[in-house]
Amino acid sequence: LGDVYKRQVYGETHSIRSDEWAVSTPRYLTAKYTDYGKYNYIIMGKQTENIAQTGLYKSYSALAKPQTWGYYLFGDSIGMSVEWCFPFILLIVMSIQFFYIIAGKNKVLAVTGGVMVAFSGYEMWWMNVEYLSCGLTALVCIYYFINAEKTWQRMVLSPCIAILGAEYITILYPAFQVPSGYVYFGIVVWMVVSSWDNFKKIKLKEWLVFAASMLFMASIVIVYLKDRSTYVTEIMNTIYPGSRVSTGGYSLYKMFEYVATIFYPFKATLNNSEFSMMVTLFPLPMVMAVYCIIKQKGKDILLDIMLGLSCVYTIYCTVGFPLIVARLTLFSYVPEERAADLLGLLQVILPVSYTHLTLPTNS
């Protein structure tokens, strides 16, 4: 930041979307002068709600946003560092751990999948994609909750799942939440089925702790929505995004943007964030998944679910859904370009899933 342009040391300057730094940074910093209270008189020159304009409000609802805790605990300088660095570091660690789980504990595949997600152009240009960091972390916690050997481990994991669940729900952006929600739900189903023996061993008192944690999650979400009720009401009464209805179609081109994404650091474009994608070699992962399913005779539930979702998302991105189907599946809240983003994630999950199935057990 600053008021004087400084010439770069090396390379060429490119225009870049400014929302994530030139807009957000001043908003975060103004909250300090309100002591992170309910109202902010600085950002718009009049009374506005801090939680709506800055996302920072020191109350019970702040439990829904772990990346902001640094502001309340250590002040704005360290808080901003945490805000920028914590989600990215978390995504790196947890994406590798997530792929370690679905790759049958194959470390090479785990690192490969984790790097393809965490260091993808999609993550780099958007920076700190919240539904990825909290979603994948929640999946890891759920897996280890199911497969934990000791009660204390499940008691620690339960509130972690609750906070991550609250964070995911309070993203309040269904364009990402709906398609990613189907993916995450499918993975949870696979975790339960594949670990059914361990799932049945979960004790009653452990379920009670988990249930209490879910109530804890619900309380955070309710308070958060109450604190943001004015903002939510105003947004829902707008033409965009409040009244937007999507039925899909005509966005499959975006699935091939991974080719261009590689060159975005070297060639200026109008909106790198919108067009960036994970490098997936689409549609090859889907073709290989079909081959593997035929060869494995459909015995891998995760591969079946991920390929099924890939086919559904491909249909939505090409020809679209009838309006009634879009409404029933909640895809009416999902612009086709956003569905393509999640289709990209599926194209990373698929090759990790079928590659580990084709490797020797002890490889």
Language-model regions, residue ranges each:
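Transmembrane signal-anchor helices characteristic of membrane glycosylation enzymes that use polyprenol
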Residues: 2-24, 212-229, 310-316
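Membrane-interfacial loop-to-transmembrane alpha-helix junctions, especially the N-terminal start
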Residues: 104-110, 151-158, 298-312, 357, ...
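Short, small-residue-biased leader/transition segments that mark boundaries at the very start
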Residues: 1-5, 358-362
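Membrane-helix boundary/interfacial segments in multi-pass membrane proteins
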Residues: 78, 82, 121-130, 299, ...
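Membrane-embedded helix bundles of polyisoprenyl
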Residues: 92-98, 106-195, 205-228
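Transmembrane alpha-helices and membrane-interface helical segments
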Residues: 94-101, 137-147, 187-192, 288-292, ...
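Active-site lumenal/periplasmic loops and adjacent helix-entry segments of GT-C-fold
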Residues: 6-133
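Periplasmic/ER-lumenal interhelical loops and adjacent helix-loop junctions
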Residues: 221-302
